[in-house]
Amino acid sequence: MVKIDLITGFLGSGKTTFIKKYAKYLLDKGMNIGILENDFGAVNVDMLLLQDLMGDNCELEMISGGCDKETHRRRFRTKLIAMGMCGYDRVIVEPSGIYDVDEFFDVLHDEPLDKWYEIGNVVTIVDAKLEPELSEEADYLLASEAANVGSIILSRAEEATKEQIENTIEHLNRALEQVQCKRRLDQEIMRKDGAELSEEDFDKILKGGYVAENYRKMDIDEKKGFDSLYFMELKISADELKTQVAKMMQDPECGGIFRVKGFVKDDAGSWMQLNATGHEISMKPIGDGQEVVIVIGEQLKEDCIRKYLEN
């Protein structure tokens, strides 16, 4: 049977960065792997960030979001059936930061997937400087992604104080309590950034497995709180984009922005990758890009955001 891992994490937590390192670790062990990118929206930016992993022993597949729940589940199942015929040793699923974890477990219990795949590890990436106050919906997503983990990685741990790290762990356990989950996390948490993980750490993650936990479910779709907005072919410089994103993330009139990501060309015509969260905004060179900026958050106000990006 093919081992299949689920790597989750709330928006901007650093899932893709971790997956690049985890995938390299698996490749160095001689494994043949497939990575399935599953984005919340209709445009998949993270796929571009993983292209340098592609080779004879690593293939990338994608499921686009932007559809209803049942359609997305059907696409996920169909893609896993196709990937089950490719001879992989291991498949890594990277869903959006807004994801119903039950979909992963439910689909893998369907025939014929239950005979082809064996769940390996469930890993969640959490920002070590997690915001102390999140909405009920956001806390639910956090809890649902943490409830079944074998390992939790605290991203940006090297930037956080000891107090911030402990507050984040308390927040995780508080979120679990709010959804009536009996589990409390401690030993499963690696208090170090993905960049600091050693081969021994990855050995431990590979053996981490998962835990089947019960918790009270919330239908996020009914809340209609999470949005993703797409802005294509913006006529804006890289420096100006970074400045405007910083401003709009501080403007409550734009809604609750969790993350902004995308690509833009600099003055020399080279691609730059934008990645913005509540803690930092970065603009880094990248080989290939796509003229798109994606804004993800709760109760977003498109007209207000558009003023920052287009004027």
What are these regions (language model features)?
Residues N148-L154, E159-G287, Q299-D303, E310:
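C-terminal accessory "lid"/substrate-recognition subdomains
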Residues Q51-G55, E145, V179-R183:
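Short, conserved catalytic or adaptor-binding loops enriched in Gly and charged residues
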Residues E111-Y117, L142-S144, I169-Q178:
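A short alpha->loop->secondary-structure connector
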Residues V2-S13, T17-S135, Y140:
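Nucleotide-state-sensitive switch-loop elements of NTP-binding domains
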Residues G34-L36, K261-V264, V295:
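Short, hydrophobic beta-strand segments that form beta-sheet elements in well-ordered domains
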Residues M1-V2, G289-E291:
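A short, charged/proline- and glycine-enriched loop
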Residues E291-G297:
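Short, well-ordered beta-strand elements
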Residues Y140-L141, N148:
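Short, glycine-/small-residue-rich phosphate/pyrophosphate-handling segment
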